[in-house]
Amino acid sequence: MEKSVNVIGAGLAGSEAAWQLVKRGVKVDLYEMRPVKQTPAHHTDKFAELVCTNSLRANGLTNAVGVIKEEMRILDSIIIEAADKASVPAGGALAVDRHEFSGYITDKVKNHPLVTVHTEEVTTIPEGPTIIATGPLTSPALADEIKQLTGEEYLYFYDAAAPIIEKDSIDMDKVYLKSRYDKGEAAYLNCPMSEEEFNAFYEALVTAETAALKEFEKEVFFEGCMPIEVMAKRGIKTMLFGPLKPVGLEDPKTGKRPYAVLQLRQDDAAGTLYNMVGFQTHLKWGEQKRVFGMIPGLENAEIVRYGVMHRNTFINSPTVLEPTYQLKTRNDLFFAGQMTGVEGYVESAASGLAAGINAANFVEEKELVVFPAETAIGSLAHYITSASKKSFQPMNVNFGLFPELETKIRAKQERNEKLAERALNAIKRVAEEL
C-alpha cells in the first residue's frame, strides 16, 4: 500500500514538511485554506508567504540563526534553497524577494508528482499520519479540535512574554540569589534598586516607545496579562506591589530590604537563560535594551528573546509533545511551526523539516530522529519539549539553548564559532544516517 501523510497548512513549516516527505518517497495530501478562506494577515494564495518582514535574519555562523540555516542547507531544506535563490542584498542577513521566494516554493511543492493539494479549510483532524502546521492564525474551528485533543488548558491564543537574558551577561556582583521569604531553595536572581534608581527607571519606562499593533491583534490584549509599561502608567507605586515588590527579599550584603527588586527566574534546564519575572512588554526592542539596561545587574544584559505581546496560537509543547514533534497521546500526529512554540520564519521551517523527516520515518516504520541538543535544530526541539510547563512561551533559536562547551571560552565570538562548529559536525552525522 502506498504510504501517505496529511499535511495541514502550506506555510513555511508545512511546505518544508511536505518537501521532506516527498524527498523520501512518501505521498502527501497538502491542505491549504487560502485563497478560499483568507487569514487577517495573508494577502496571496502562495505557499510559505512571508507576512511580516522579508528577512530571514543573520547568515553568519557566529549567530545561532545562521547556524540553523546552515544545518537546514545540509538537510536539503526547500525553504533555505528558495531563500538562497531569491536573496536580495542585505549585508550580513539573508533577505529575500518575497514573491520570488514563495513563488519558487509553491511551484516546486505543488508540481511534485507525490503532492496532492486540497484547497479547503480543515475543521477536523484527519485519521492517519498527519502533520498540523497551521500557524499562529489557525482558524477557530481547527483550534477547537486541537483544544479537544491537547486539553483546553494547553492551547494559547496570544503570546505575552517577558524578555529572556543570557546568564553570562548579568553582573553577578550586583545581584543575589534568594527566594521570597527564603521559601524553598534560593531559586531567583534578584536585582535590587534604590529609590533613586527606581524613579529613574520608572520615568524611562513610562515614556518609552511601544511597538505598533497590527489590526488583527488588537482583540487579544490584556486578558489578565498586562504589559509592564501599562501597569507603570497606573501609578508610580503600582509596580512596587507587583513585579518589583521587595517584601521578603532582603539583600544579604546589607541585610536591608531594597526599595524595589526585579526577580530573574531560570528559564532552561541548563541554567544559562533567565527571564524577567512579570515583565511582559510591548516596548520596541531597542527601548527594551535601553530601559531594562537601567536595572542594576542588567547594564550589559544580552537579551536573547525580547518581550513580545502578539496574536499567536500555540500548544504547551513541554506537556504534550515529544522531541520528535509527535503528540504524546497520538503517535501518528505531529505538530510543526509556530504552533509548537518555535518563534520565527526559519525556526518554523526547521521544525517542519524535523517533523517531515520523522513523519516519513514513522510511515516507513523506521526509528524516529531526536536531533542532538548540540545542533540548532535539536536545541530548539529540546527547549520546546523540556522548558517550564507553567511558564512556557515561544522561543527563537539562540546560543543560550545550546549545551555548554566542555571547555569554557570567555570571548563571545570564539565561543559562538566553537558552538557552530560542534553543531555542524553533529548535523553532518545525522545527515549521513538519514
Swiss-Prot record:
FAD binds at residues 9-14. GO terms for biological process: tRNA methylation; tRNA wobble uridine modification. It is an enzyme of class 2 (transferase). Keywords: Cytoplasm, FAD, Flavoprotein, Methyltransferase, NAD, NADP, Transferase, tRNA processing. GO terms for cellular component: cytosol. Its EC number is 2.1.1.74. Signal peptide: none annotated. It is found in: Cytoplasm. It holds the Pfam family GIDA. It catalyses: uridine(54) in tRNA + (6R)-5,10-methylene-5,6,7,8-tetrahydrofolate + NADH + H(+) = 5-methyluridine(54) in tRNA + (6S)-5,6,7,8-tetrahydrofolate + NAD(+); uridine(54) in tRNA + (6R)-5,10-methylene-5,6,7,8-tetrahydrofolate + NADPH + H(+) = 5-methyluridine(54) in tRNA + (6S)-5,6,7,8-tetrahydrofolate + NADP(+). Belongs to the MnmG family. TrmFO subfamily. This is Methylenetetrahydrofolate--tRNA-(uracil-5-)-methyltransferase TrmFO. The gene is trmFO.
